[in-house]
């Protein structure tokens, strides 16, 4: 629902709760059934926006879960930042599934991060799916997540962006020809599997899933 750049425009900040309730109600009434909610993307201390920082995450989650239609609610999480950050115990207790981001992690660091989540008391009390829904383009990180029994998210920014972690997307400008456009994040986007980086991921995924 929220990310730091747009959330900081909310005045007063408490509008977060009203928005979370209204959007959840709209989703419940939409008729779509397979909906998972990430209440705030990469909630982290660096937000400098207390209402969506780790200490308040449980309230955001409970706002979403407390919005129901005919007794039905939506499964909800809040994703962490990349690097070493994992959710607090209260955060883990509140959410239905866990979404640690793997941006910036080497494979061994990602495995360690996922193990740290699974070693928490909150996770042991109630094991749940762990979904690394944002990481990188590196297939070795996919392998690391799978080795820990977790799913993994291919995050392919595309050249011409200011974003950089293990991959430097500032290495050259945005491609000028549509057929050559890299990534799935930097606009304009070519949704085809048209670059070696994209092909490496989808070919590995095809092998894992025994796809046709």
Region roles according to the model:
Residues 1-14:
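Substrate-binding cleft and catalytic face of glycoside hydrolase catalytic domains
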Residues 12, 138, 195-198:
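Alpha-helix initiation/capping motif
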Residues 18-24, 29, 34-193:
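Extracellular glycoside hydrolase catalytic/binding regions
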Residues 22, 201-208:
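Charge-rich, solvent-exposed alpha-helical interaction surfaces
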Residues 191-195, 201-203:
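Eukaryote-biased activation of long, low-complexity terminal tails and linkers
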Residues 210-212:
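Low-complexity, Pro/Thr/Ser/Gly/Ala-rich linker/spacer regions in secreted
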């Amino acid at each position: 629902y929220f990310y730091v750049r747009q959330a900081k425009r909310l005045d007063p900040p408490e509008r977060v709760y009203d928005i979370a309730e209204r959007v959840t109600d709209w989703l419940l009434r939409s008729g779509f059934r397979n909906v998972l909610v990430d209440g705030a993307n990469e909630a982290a201390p660096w937000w400098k926006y207390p209402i969506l920082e780790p200490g308040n995450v449980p309230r955001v989650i409970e706002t979403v879960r407390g919005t129901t239609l005919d007794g039905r609610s939506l499964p909800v999480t809040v994703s962490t930042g990349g690097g070493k950050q994992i959710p607090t115990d209260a955060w883990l207790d509140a959410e239905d599934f866990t979404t640690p981001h793997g941006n910036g992690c080497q494979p061994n660091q990602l495995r360690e991060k996922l193990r740290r989540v699974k070693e928490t008391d909150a996770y042991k009390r109630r094991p749940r799916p762990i979904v690394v829904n944002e990481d990188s383009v590196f297939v070795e990180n996919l392998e690391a997540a799978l080795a820990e029994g977790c799913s993994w998210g291919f995050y392919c920014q595309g050249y011409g962006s200011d974003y950089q972690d293990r991959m430097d997307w500032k290495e050259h400008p945005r491609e000028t020809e549509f057929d050559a456009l890299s990534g799935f994040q930097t606009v304009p986007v070519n949704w085809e599997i048209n670059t070696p980086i994209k092909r490496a991921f989808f070919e590995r995924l095809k092998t894992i899933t025994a796809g046709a």
